[in-house]
Amino acid sequence: MVFVNLQLKIKKGLESEFIDELNVLLKETRSYEGCHAVYFIQNQDDASNIEFCSKWDSKQHYEKYLQWRIESGVLEETANKYGDGEPVWRYFDLVSEF
């Protein structure tokens, strides 16, 4: 099991539009093979700071999903339209669950 954290900075004033668009796209993410959960969160103090936390069977499952998003063109299109800086990906192993 792997948790993927994707940190994004969104162009000021486009946060609501970005959220609306991503809420549609994330339904496809959730149904992708190997995905168990996706959380889309927004910083309370800076609305342009948005993160995705997702739970996957493995890093390979996530990488396959990411490649699909890259090949579809949606990742580049969304980044060009809304992104304000480079995204940051971090991968975490589950240590304990209570």
Q: Where are the regions that the model predicts?
A:
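Short amphipathic alpha-helical/adjacent loop interface patches that line ligand
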Residues: L22, L26
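An amphipathic, aromatic/His-enriched active-site/gating alpha helix that lines ligand/cofactor pockets
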Residues: S31-H36, K55-W89
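Short, well-ordered beta-strand segments in beta-rich or mixed alpha/beta enzyme
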Residues: V2-L8, Y39-L66
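A short acidic, often aromatic-flanked loop/helix-cap motif at beta-alpha or helix-coil junctions
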Residues: V95-F98
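Generic structural signal for individual residues within well-ordered alpha-helical segments
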Residues: S16-I19, E63
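Solvent-exposed beta-strand sheet faces enriched in polar/charged residues
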Residues: I41, R90-F92
